[in-house]
């Protein structure tokens, strides 16, 4: 994406959880969903109760759709997604 002088790229923070929860090690419904996000060149901060990544406003819908397709096609029963603007630092 090419920005003109003075334009700012809006970044969004996407937090997500994928069920069922598997004790000990995440199942393929989680690992494949994370892999789907990372195929877009985005790093996922993986946590035990939820994970997150940052994406541009333009790329977020495609990344989330790919993540959800991967999760459900590998056995997810519920996916929760929350999206917020990244706070200015």
Features from the language model and the residues they span:
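Charge-rich, low-complexity N-terminal segments
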Residues: 2-89
